[in-house]
């Protein structure tokens, strides 16, 4: 990410230049943090604000965690539930949790849900040992080039996404690279 920013490929997303330390170390963002619990929610066609939907689910999960492990499982003084709202490397945490891989379209792709997902996180103050933790999923795009070929501006080039060339960066409405992705077939 640092190299991508240094090359100016992030365009005017200046917020990506700030708080880099927090992006790489959640304990700076949430003092006492030891674990990032991640979840994915498939795109909702209803038009509801996904931030609210994901956070609502995470607040319910937080209540269950507090019931099971006590109030100290989360920070009482710092925001610890996030959905596209804090300097978090959301895709990185999802990959590490085994929830998907980063595809050639530079999106997180879950093998079943596809890339039309919204991640959310709860940062907790306890280490978590998961007996059946999934290993990170290998990049499964193989020889597929559909997203690269579908990109109307050439913003997707092999290992690089150039935000300054991406239509979604300027309009928020281009999904061409996702619409052609085989992992999104029949998922709408």
Residue spans for each PLM region:
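Auxiliary alpha/beta "docking" domains used to position bulky ligands
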Residues: 1-132, 136-140, 168, 187-188
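Iron-sulfur cluster-binding cysteine motifs and their immediate structural context
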Residues: 146-168, 172-188
């Amino acid at each position: 990410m640092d190299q991508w920013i240094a090359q100016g490929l992030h365009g005017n997303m200046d917020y990506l230049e700030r708080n880099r330390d927090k992006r790489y170390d959640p304990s700076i963002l949430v003092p006492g943090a030891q674990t990032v619990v991640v979840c994915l929610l498939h795109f909702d066609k209803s038009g509801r604000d996904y931030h609210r939907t994901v956070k609502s689910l995470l607040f319910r999960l937080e209540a269950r965690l507090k019931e099971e492990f006590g109030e100290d499982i989360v920070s009482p003084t710092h925001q610890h539930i996030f959905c596209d709202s804090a300097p978090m490397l959301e895709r990185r945490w999802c990959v590490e949790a085994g929830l998907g891989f980063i595809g050639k379209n530079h999106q997180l792709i879950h093998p079943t849900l596809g890339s039309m997902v919204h991640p959310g996180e709860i940062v907790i103050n306890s280490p978590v040992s998961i007996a059946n933790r999934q290993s990170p999923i290998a990049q499964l795009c193989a020889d597929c080039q559909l997203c690269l070929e579908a990109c109307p501006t050439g913003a997707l080039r092999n290992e690089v996404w150039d935000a300054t060339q991406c239509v979604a960066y300027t309009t928020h409405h281009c999904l061409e690279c996702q619409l052609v992705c085989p992992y999104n077939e029949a998922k709408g």
